[in-house]
Amino acid sequence: MDVNSADKWEADYQHGGDGWDLGAPTPVFRNLLENGQLSPGKMLVVCAGRGHDAREFARHGYQVTAVDFSPFAAQEMSRLAVPGTPMEILQRDLFTLPHGLDETFDYVLEYTCYCAIDPKRRNEFVDLIDRLLKPGGIYISLAFPLTQKIGGPPFAVTVSELLRLFQERGFKLIEREQPSESVPQRRGAEELLMFQKPVMR
């Protein structure tokens, strides 16, 4: 089924094919919040799924917008919403986010999204991130799966490709680590990367 179609992701959710969902906030992101490395701001969570990470950042005072292609995922985000922890939920193709959101966000958060996108659209994805972030904004990615596998999804991800795509657009790599907090089944197959958009071009 076409990864560019909401039907593919809807079917995965409806039939238990959502193995990317950890069922809780990502430990690596939780550690970021606990160590105070980032300051609260406006955050877009792409391919947000059931919203575990989006809710965790909202709970820590971030103004969160969470977007997912799947109607089921958006419904789950609404169902699991925590009173007093507001966040905006958008059910739509992230490539169709309106230009009214251009340069709106201090952060874009990504996990198991880049690997789900048709590799032919990766340039388009990075252009989208560039468009949505404020000058000086930060793209936070837990890049996964770092592998040479053929086919997908999940499609293989390489740090070298991410470095090339973001640095071509003037982004600066400000953080790179292989986190010890990764869940055991993904340890060694993911890296935390942060790229900062230039303030001026």
Model-derived segments and spans:
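Short catalytic micro-motifs in class I SAM-dependent methyltransferases
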Residues: 112, 116
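A conserved beta-strand element that flanks and buttresses the S-adenosyl-L-methionine
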Residues: 109
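Conserved acidic residues
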Residues: 106
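Class I (Rossmann-like) S-adenosyl-L-methionine-dependent methyltransferase catalytic domain
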Residues: 1-45, 49-101, 117-201
